[in-house]
From Swiss-Prot:
UniProt subcellular location: Cytoplasm
Known pathway: Lipid metabolism; fatty acid biosynthesis
HAMAP family according to UniProt: Acyl_carrier (MF_01217)
Keyword NADP among record annotations: no
GO annotation, cellular component aspect: cytosol; membrane
Carrier domain mapped to chain residues: 2-77
Modification O-(pantetheine 4'-phosphoryl)serine occurs at: 37
GO MF term list: acyl binding; acyl carrier activity; phosphopantetheine binding
Name this polypeptide is given: Acyl carrier protein
Family matches, as SMART domains: PKS_PP (SM00823)
């Protein structure tokens, strides 16, 4: 697991109040991890803070799974 993947999974677990072991790459935030729309907004904000990036709304709407979040952070992180 890459450092970015580990950081993303930690953020997701903290934001959604689930065990980190439940946060696997194929899990969807809403269907599998019980997130609601406010949770997903807060999750995007936490990812922005962690990785020093800005996620436009049209991109945020496409980040619906753990793998989507890992891929987006990997591609767009500022260092």
């Amino acid at each position: 697991m890459s450092d970015i993947e580990a950081r993303v999974k930690k953020i997701i677990a903290e934001q959604l109040g689930v065990e980190e072991s439940q946060v696997t790459n194929e899990k969807a935030f809403v269907a599998d991890l019980g997130a609601d729309s406010l949770d997903t907004v807060e999750l995007v904000m936490a990812l922005e803070d962690e990785f020093g990036i800005e996620i436009p709304d049209e991109d945020a709407e496409k980040i619906t799974t753990v793998q989507n979040a890992v891929d987006y952070a990997t591609k767009n992180q500022k260092a």
